[in-house]
C-alpha cells in the first residue's frame, strides 16, 4: 500500500514537471508580429482578446501553483501516514497473540481428528461395546477447554455428543421389529 502511494506521488510530481516545461517552452519562443497583426492591435476587439489571454495566463499560473500545493500536501500526508502507521503497528504487535490462538486451534483440530478416528475404528470393529463410558467422556470433554473461554459453545458440543450417543445406543439396543 505504501508503494502505491509513493508511485502516485511520483507520478504527480513528474506530470507537474512536464507541464511546467512545456509551458516554459511555449512562453520562451519569440513571437513574430507581422504588419497586419500590428494594425489589429489598434482594434478594440483585439484588446479584449489580449485581456482574455492575460487572464488565462494568470489562471494558468494560479492553477499550477494550486497543483504544486496539492502535491506537497499529498506528500506530507503520505509521510505522516507512514510515521503514524509505524507507531500503531508497534503498539498493535504488543497486544497481538496470534501464536497462542493458532496453537489452541491446532490442538482442537488434532483432538477432533482423533475422536473421528476412534469412532470409525469403533464402527469397523463391529460395535464391540454396546454402551459408552459417559461419565469418563463428560469429565474428559470438560477438561478440554479452549483458551478463548467459549464455555457455551463447548457445552452445546458436549450435549450434542451425548444426544448422539444416546441415539446410537437406542439404535443398537432396539430390535428390528420394534423399529417399524
UniProtKB/Swiss-Prot annotation:
Q: Which Gene3D superfamilies match?
A: 6.10.250.590
Could you list this entry's UniProt keywords, alphabetically sorted: Amidation, Cleavage on pair of basic residues, Hormone, Phosphoprotein, Secreted, Signal
Q: What induces it?
A: Glucagon release is stimulated by hypoglycemia and inhibited by hyperglycemia, insulin, and somatostatin. GLP-1 and GLP-2 are induced in response to nutrient ingestion.
Which family is annotated? Belongs to the glucagon family.
Arginine amide PTM positions: 127
- Pfam families per the UniProt record, alphabetical: Hormone_2
Q: Which residues form the propeptide?
A: 84-89, 131-145
Q: How is this chain modified after translation?
A: Proglucagon is post-translationally processed in a tissue-specific manner in pancreatic A cells and intestinal L cells. In pancreatic A cells, the major bioactive hormone is glucagon cleaved by PCSK2/PC2. In the intestinal L cells PCSK1/PC1 liberates GLP-1, GLP-2, glicentin and oxyntomodulin. GLP-1 is further N-terminally truncated by post-translational processing in the intestinal L cells resulting in GLP-1(7-37) GLP-1-(7-36)amide. The C-terminal amidation is neither important for the metabolism of GLP-1 nor for its effects on the endocrine pancreas.
Location (main, coarse): secreted
Keyword Secreted appears in the UniProt entry: yes
Gene Ontology molecular function terms on file: glucagon receptor binding; hormone activity; identical protein binding
Q: What is any one of the record's Gene Ontology cellular component terms?
A: plasma membrane
**Listed GO biological process terms:** adenylate cyclase-activating G protein-coupled receptor signaling pathway; cellular response to glucagon stimulus; gluconeogenesis; glucose homeostasis; negative regulation of execution phase of apoptosis; positive regulation of calcium ion import; positive regulation of ERK1 and ERK2 cascade; positive regulation of gluconeogenesis
Any S-S bridges, and between which cysteines?
A: none
What is the superkingdom listed in this entry's lineage?
Eukaryota
Identify the residue position(s) of the site Cleavage: 52-53, 83-84, 91-92, 97-98, 130-131, 145-146
Source organism (scientific name):
Cavia porcellus
Q: Where in the cell is it found?
A: Secreted
Q: Indicate the secretion signal residues.
A: 1-20
What's this protein's name? Pro-glucagon
Under SMART domains, the record lists:
GLUCA (SM00070)
Keyword Transferase on entry? no
Q: Quote the gene name from the UniProt entry.
A: GCG
For the modification Phosphoserine, the affected residues are 54, 105, 108, 150, 152
Q: Where is this region: Disordered?
A: 23-58
